[in-house]
């Protein structure tokens, strides 16, 4: 039987996997800011879809990536990209850099996404495996709810600060290491 910390570290990887829309509470403020820079509302809304396209691309590239880098390195890189790529808008509020930020976030999530499931499937068996896979799904929902709630409090400071929720990937990285 695996220790509690090992199980928690694997499950915590799923906390960030469905977080791409968490900062969407700030969308009206972002539309106002980027409209002043000459961007249409649809272009600003596209920023939130962009991460999903990057995740999809990474999932398609995953068989190649698995041959090039280890599972551990993939997870470490993924968490670092989520933390630093995802939180870039805290510092940089230009459309082009937020665009890059959303791509980096998607790449980071994509590096972890399939691994979060496969690690559990490879590490556990039987009832324990089923329980861990169920908990993993619950951790996704908990992560999304928690990050969205935090964004609700942060948005009053300013839209760019809502992206600081992606820094929660750093404590997850610390637990994983």
Language model features with spans:
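Cytoplasmic helix-loop-helix junction between adjacent transmembrane helices
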Residues: 95, 101-139
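Helix-loop-helix hairpin linking two adjacent transmembrane segments in secondary transporters
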Residues: 97, 127, 135-177
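Conserved MFS/SLC helix-loop-helix module at the cytosolic interface between two early adjacent transmembrane helices
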Residues: 57-95
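Extracellular/periplasmic helix-loop-helix junction of adjacent transmembrane segments
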Residues: 27-56
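Extracytoplasmic
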Residues: 5-37, 62
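Interfacial helix-cap and linker-helix signal at transmembrane-aqueous boundaries
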Residues: 30-31, 35, 65-66, 150-158
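Residue-level signature of mid-helix packing/kink "hotspots" within the transmembrane helices
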Residues: 21, 51-60, 144-145
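MFS 12-TM fold signature
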Residues: 55, 81-86, 105, 169-173
């Amino acid at each position: 039987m695996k220790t509690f910390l090992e199980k928690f570290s694997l499950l915590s990887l799923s906390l960030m996997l469905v977080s791409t829309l968490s900062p969407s509470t700030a969308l009206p403020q972002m539309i106002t800011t980027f409209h002043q820079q000459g961007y249409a509302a649809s272009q600003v809304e596209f920023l939130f879809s962009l991460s999903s396209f990057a995740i999809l691309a990474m999932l398609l590239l995953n068989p190649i990536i698995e041959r090039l880098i280890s599972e551990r390195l993939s997870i470490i890189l993924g968490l670092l990209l989520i933390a630093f790529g995802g939180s870039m808008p805290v510092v940089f509020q230009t459309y082009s850099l937020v665009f890059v930020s959303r791509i980096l976030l998607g790449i980071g999530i994509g590096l972890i996404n399939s691994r979060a499931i496969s690690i559990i499937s490879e590490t556990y068996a039987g009832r324990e495996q089923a329980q861990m896979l169920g908990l993993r799904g619950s951790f996704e929902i908990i992560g999304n709810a928690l990050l969205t709630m935090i964004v609700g409090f942060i948005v009053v400071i300013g839209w760019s600060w809502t992206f600081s929720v992606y820094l929660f990937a750093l404590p997850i990285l610390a637990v994983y290491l």
